[in-house]
């Protein structure tokens, strides 16, 4: 069944398309969208896709997500396309890509890293050191992390 038969087009907001089948809920969790924000969100799971066989789609009405916000989902949805919708038209389309730097979102896995010390208010920071597959290094202790380890 086509996605159009399941959910209609949105007027303004963001459509995350070409999510690997079955990962839409994980994408929402990573984006921190729980439903409690009051945003209208539509989820389409396991619909036909020419490129992927099957895919998931997330439609968020009334909020334009920035590349910085969505690039983090590249760990679970590297194939995702982000469409910004205004007045029912796609005005921007971009593919997710691993972020060059991630600040403040995730904890370093090294228990002795200064960012994990109880009285050190240091913001965890990770730099991208390899793009394919994405690998990050902690700016403080040098521990390497795959994006999947951080999530
Ligand atoms: N979409 C939507 N509401 C709109 C416009 C588009 O929900 N007002 C959705 C479409 O249903 C589709 C995605 O946004 O899932 C991208 O739309 P579009 O670029 O028109 O589709 P395609 O050309 O098929 O996209 P692509 O080339 O990225 O596969």
From Swiss-Prot:
GO molecular function: metal ion binding
Xref: Pfam families: PyrI (PF01948), PyrI_C (PF02748)
Cofactor: Zn(2+)
GO biological process terms on file: 'de novo' pyrimidine nucleobase biosynthetic process; pyrimidine nucleotide biosynthetic process
Annotated Zn(2+) binding sites: 108, 113, 138, 141
Annotated keywords: Metal-binding, Pyrimidine biosynthesis, Zinc
UniProt remark on cofactor binding: Binds 1 zinc ion per subunit.
InterPro entries noted in UniProt: Asp_carbamoyltransf_reg_N, Asp_carbamoylTrfase_reg, Asp_carbamoyltrfase_reg_C, Asp_carbatrfase_reg_C_sf, Asp_carbatrfase_reg_N_sf
Cellular component annotations (GO), alphabetically ordered: aspartate carbamoyltransferase complex
Subunit-level organization: Contains catalytic and regulatory chains.
Cited HAMAP family: Asp_carb_tr_reg
General function of this protein: Involved in allosteric regulation of aspartate carbamoyltransferase.
Family of this protein: Belongs to the PyrI family.
Name under which the protein is recorded: Aspartate carbamoyltransferase regulatory chain
């Amino acid at each position: 069944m086509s996605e159009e038969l399941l959910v209609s087009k949105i007027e303004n907001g963001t459509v995350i398309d070409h999510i690997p089948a079955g990962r839409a809920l994980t994408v929402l969790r990573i984006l921190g969208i729980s439903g409690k924000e009051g945003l209208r969100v539509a989820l389409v799971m396991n619909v036909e896709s020419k490129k992927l066989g099957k895919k998931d789609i997330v439609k968020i009405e009334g909020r334009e997500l920035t590349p910085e916000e969505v690039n983090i989902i590249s760990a679970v949805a590297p194939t995702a396309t982000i469409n910004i919708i205004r007045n029912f038209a796609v005005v921007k389309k971009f593919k997710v890509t691993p972020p060059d730097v991630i600040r403040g979102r995730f904890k370093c896995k090294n228990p002795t890293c200064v960012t994990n010390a109880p009285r050190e208010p240091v913001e965890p920071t990770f730099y991208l050191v390899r793009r394919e597959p994405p690998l990050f290094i902690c700016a403080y202790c040098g521990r390497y992390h795959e994006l999947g380890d951080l999530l």
